[in-house]
């Protein structure tokens, strides 16, 4: 079943790529042409590729698979966290720490430290130590929560990655490739699609486009949707964006 329509994509500006001088020739099969020195993405390619990716994500979700959402740039950060939490999944929405997947043993130790500090902050330990020491631990807790808060309950490596902006998150993609973890990614005209198992050619900069991708994923894999159609969800999102 098609979740996203061509009309939804056009309204969200999914077809707008980057300036032609920044293009990656490997994206040529997905480019319709150019307008005012900006590449136009062929939505007749994007639409079926995205809907297929959504159906594959749904299969992973139904098997209780762990999906790690990755989007550390400003246009994606807030929505990535929102979507992952809404779907009881996991996220990295600030800086990707090198080795987050490939050096999981060390990451697991940092997660343990984060959880220990969380317990200390809640059980009164911070009030029993000096103010200076409490401040140091509070800062450490904040830093760890920022980096690892979205994966602290993942309990092991994810079953797949869903990435906004393949170029920006290339380290995460390389790590997933090394471990054989499937990668779903929004790939703009300036990006290299190599290493992405499920390529979704599209605008990765506009907040409306990013919102469309994530709401479509949410609709595919989350159980707690309120029954609204996809177009109604986008309309609600537009209203919220205008208020903000």
UniProtKB/Swiss-Prot annotation:
Gene3D superfamilies: Glucose-6-phosphate isomerase like protein, domain 1 (3.40.50.10490), Helix hairpin bin (1.10.287.610). It comes from the Bacteria. PROSITE patterns: RIBOSOMAL_S2_1 (PS00962), RIBOSOMAL_S2_2 (PS00963). Pfam families: Ribosomal_S2. The keyword Ribonucleoprotein applies. GO terms for biological process: translation. CDD domains: RPS2. GO terms for molecular function: structural constituent of ribosome. GO terms for cellular component: cytosolic small ribosomal subunit. Keywords: Ribonucleoprotein, Ribosomal protein. NCBIfam families: rpsB_bact. HAMAP family: Ribosomal_uS2_B. Belongs to the universal ribosomal protein uS2 family. This is Small ribosomal subunit protein uS2.
